[in-house]
Amino acid sequence: MTKALLIYLVSSFLALNQASLISRCDLAQVLQLEDLDGFEGYSLSDWLCLAFVESKFNISKINENADGSFDYGLFQINSHYWCNDYKSYSENLCHVDCQDLLNPNLLAGIHCAKRIVSGARGMNNWVEWRLHCSGRPLFYWLTGCRLR
């Protein structure tokens, strides 16, 4: 199955079911197809752990922060720094509308997360990843997933 077809099928399934959740193994397949395994030294398990601790695999999650900014999507990407929600000032370092981070095809969120991880702090940009994933054995995140 081609990369584009798999992403299309996963996003179609989510849209048809009006679901905002993606399964752990479906997400692992998409992340692998987008070459995140080993990206900047992080494993697929790191990415899965990040998505779980930030959003519980909820693609459409939006969270308001105490400073008035919002976090969007699977990776809870912040509107003050990374995306523009047109509600308050944003540096918009990913050059993306925050609403695009809620898209079931996941690509806008993945591309922005890759940009964030490419910076000096890597996944340490996410407090929840530091608290719950960093330095821990994460092999179980891929248990039962059939990857290519």
Curated annotation (Swiss-Prot):
SMART domains: LYZ1. It comes from the Eukaryota. Keywords: Antimicrobial, Bacteriolytic enzyme, Cell projection, Cilium, Disulfide bond, Fertilization, Flagellum, Glycosidase, Hydrolase, Secreted, Signal. It catalyses: Hydrolysis of (1->4)-beta-linkages between N-acetylmuramic acid and N-acetyl-D-glucosamine residues in a peptidoglycan and between N-acetyl-D-glucosamine residues in chitodextrins. Its main location: secreted. Its EC number is 3.2.1.17. It holds the Pfam family Lys. It is found in: Secreted; Cell surface; Cell projection, Cilium, Flagellum. Expressed in testis, epididymis and spermatozoa (at protein level). Expressed in late-stage spermatocytes and round spermatids. Disulfide bonds join 25-145, 49-133, 83-98, 94-112. One of its GO terms (molecular function) is lysozyme activity. The keyword Chaperone does not apply. May be involved sperm-egg plasma membrane adhesion and fusion during fertilization. Exhibits bacteriolytic activity in vitro against Micrococcus luteus and Staphylococcus aureus. Shows weak bacteriolytic activity against Gram-positive bacteria at physiological pH. Bacteriolytic activity is pH-dependent, with a maximum at around pH 5.6. Belongs to the glycosyl hydrolase 22 family. Monomer. This is Lysozyme-like protein 6. It comes from Homo sapiens.
